Amino acid sequence: MQGHAGFFKALGVDLPLKTFAAPQQVDELILPELGFGWSDRYAGSPAYRRFMMSRLSAAAEPDGCDRLYISRARLPAARGGVLAEEAIEQNLARLGYEIFHPERHPVEVQIARYRAAKSVIALDGSALHLAAYVLPQGARVTMILRRSRANATDYIRQYKSFLGITPAVVDVIRHDWIAGDAGRADFRSVGELDLPRLFDTFKTMGLIPRDFSPDLPDAHQLRAMLQSLRDRRGEPFRILGSDATRAQDKAA
């Protein structure tokens, strides 16, 4: 619980919080209704939405750029992501987007950045769930899928319920690279995106100028990035799907 102290502080919860490593006997047990959770519960109960949105919005004033890219590029190698996210960062930074790595900031700074943003681009991930509590009404959210099994429906349900907006979902996945004993794309997998198509999609959506020419890695550079990731994680990757062996041979 100690690692969550900043979040509880942002919520204005100052009661002592204790955890127990062994079973306990209590005189009275209060089990509240689950206000938020999986599937349909991503919409949140009305009471939960009011509480979370009001408390977190009060934790920090808006501070930051009105165009924000939420990045996973500096997360540990064991966490999932996409190849060449740094290229996405660099090109969006050229266009004036603030590149934000939320795990490097306290929750109050994260809230301040999200409250200031009118346009957010991000890979699917937990940072988008926090942003849904505090983004301004009318904000534009673009979610890039990083894995083919990402449940975009959950994010859409949350944003429609909390903010009345529908995130745009961009699916330009070429391959899911999986490791270990994984049989499907999961939180550890790495997506290989069709980067030219990604930026063409941004142009069609009006997120970037149509005459913008992105600087993108070629196939050789992408394979070098994949090898670097293999080295850092200490395990081989394979492409999910029937063409895995052929693709790995080409990558080698």
Where would I find each of the regions flagged by the language model?
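The feature primarily captures lumenal catalytic ectodomains
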Residues: M1-A252
